Amino acid sequence: MAQHTVYFPDAFLTQMREAMPSTLSFDDFLAACQRPLRRSIRVNTLKISVADFLQLTASYGWTLTPIPWCEEGFWIERDDEDALPLGSTAEHLSGLFYIQEASSMLPVAALFADGNAPQRVMDVAAAPGSKTTQIAARMNNEGAILANEFSASRVKVLHANISRCGIRNVALTHFDGRVFGAALPEMFDAILLDAPCSGEGVVRKDPDALKNWSPESNQEIAATQRELIDSAFHALCPGGTLVYSTCTLNQEENEAVCRWLKETYPDAVEFLPLGDLFPGANKALTEEGFLHVFPQIYDCEGFFVARLRKTQAIPALPAPKYKVGNFPFSPVKDREAGQIRQAAAGVGLNWDENLRLWQRDKELWLFPVGIEALIGKVRFSRLGIKLAETHNKGYRWQHEAVIALASPDNMNAFELTPQEAEEWYRGRDVYPQAAPVADDVLVTFQHQPIGLAKRIGSRLKNSYPRELVRDGKLFTGNA
């Protein structure tokens, strides 16, 4: 694999020499940093099993190497890498996999280790969505996830990825993560804090990542991280699990932040060792039981992961002074909800008791029941999935609901050919050789729902959202 030139400040190299265990070679570290990062994907098991995915892609010339800490994760090498971006493959467009760096699969693996099965989870710094979607898959779309993102521009990307992956148990918020300890005390069974950091571990992906690096900036970032982990710890239920992670390598932003929390709450913080998380985890294990992943150990990004348990309650923070404002939605009455459910089932949309119908004007939404306890305590950017808009003739079903709720085995499902599916993703109407009978048609490809179409004569009217329409080459040559 080709080398690329990484910029290393001298002070950074000195810091790494001091931080690196004697069992590791500094020369190996430098060599690993100069190699481009291996690409990796995670199969979205909400849509397809790993076995079925491997069978589906077997003829594509993809070499998939299992990632030890994630059963759904694979390093990928492709024959058609230059001809077709991985994000333009049919399997990516329909949400069958997520392009995710291997190291970033570690925090969620730690969150669910040892049979941990949380019902209400917070992802404090969630965009672009790799870990939120991984959490949702581990929860099998049940329970509830609060996915927060401080950057306004990244909230839209977060929602797009959640929607593409067919996730329905998520509420989105847009706050500084330091507010949650006061706003939502002891509300979560598990919390992932993948903290903003100096990014020292990402030089294989971005050779200039350290251009603005300095020891002083590390100290400033670590101060923010301490405030974030303190807030997250307050939002965690007693007995709950907190995973703290970064994509950086210095100890000040990693081990020292976790030690600070334990020193602050000595009777409430327990470090849960990660040496048994996967075969070979001991190669990255610190004396506290954290994983400090230098890039040469597993040939991936540099990363840090710690798992903590809150063993008892801690004194509450002062209640926030802000007002949330009126919640603009109201629950749909049972009788009307039954009619809506029946109409939705007619086009192949079904949901379980984990979701409840709410209404705002002519909009119908499905909210995860597990998030209802947070209503009135925090303002949401987006909650659950938009099911439909009502109009005189019935319902206008929404694309995100089709992706999240539709069964490809519905009687009105219509499987497109590769050529027809390509037209669909380009936003064009489809003219199948044998038109379906139903007026409302659930459009599928590779036995996966990709949209809802109106049949007009022999034409299927395209309803694919304009912002998702693709140009250029689509699909593998074998699709």
Swiss-Prot record:
PROSITE patterns: NOL1_NOP2_SUN, SAM_MT_RSMB_NOP
Gene Ontology annotations of biological process type: rRNA base methylation
Protein name: Ribosomal RNA small subunit methyltransferase F
Keyword annotations: Cytoplasm, Methyltransferase, RNA-binding, rRNA processing, S-adenosyl-L-methionine, Transferase
Family indicated by similarity: Belongs to the class I-like SAM-binding methyltransferase superfamily. RsmB/NOP family.
GO cellular component terms, A-Z: cytoplasm
GO molecular function, a single term: RNA binding
E.C. numbers: 2.1.1.178
Recorded catalytic activity of this chain's protein: cytidine(1407) in 16S rRNA + S-adenosyl-L-methionine = 5-methylcytidine(1407) in 16S rRNA + S-adenosyl-L-homocysteine + H(+)
Residues involved in S-adenosyl-L-methionine binding: A125, A126, A127, P128, G129, S130, K131, E149, D176, D194
Enzyme class: transferase
Role played: Specifically methylates the cytosine at position 1407 (m5C1407) of 16S rRNA.
Disulfide bonds: none
PANTHER family recorded: 28S RRNA (CYTOSINE(4447)-C(5))-METHYLTRANSFERASE-RELATED, NOP2 YEAST -RELATED NOL1/NOP2/FMU SUN DOMAIN-CONTAINING
Active site per the UniProt annotation: C247 (nucleophile)
UniProt-annotated location(s): Cytoplasm
InterPro entries from the UniProt entry: Methyltr_RsmF_N (IPR031341), MeTrfase_RsmB-F_NOP2_cat (IPR049560), MeTrfase_RsmB-F_NOP2_dom (IPR001678), Nol1_Nop2_Fmu_2 (IPR027391), Nop2p (IPR011023), RCMT (IPR023267), rRNA_ssu_MeTfrase_F (IPR023545), RsmB/NOL1/NOP2-like_CS (IPR018314)
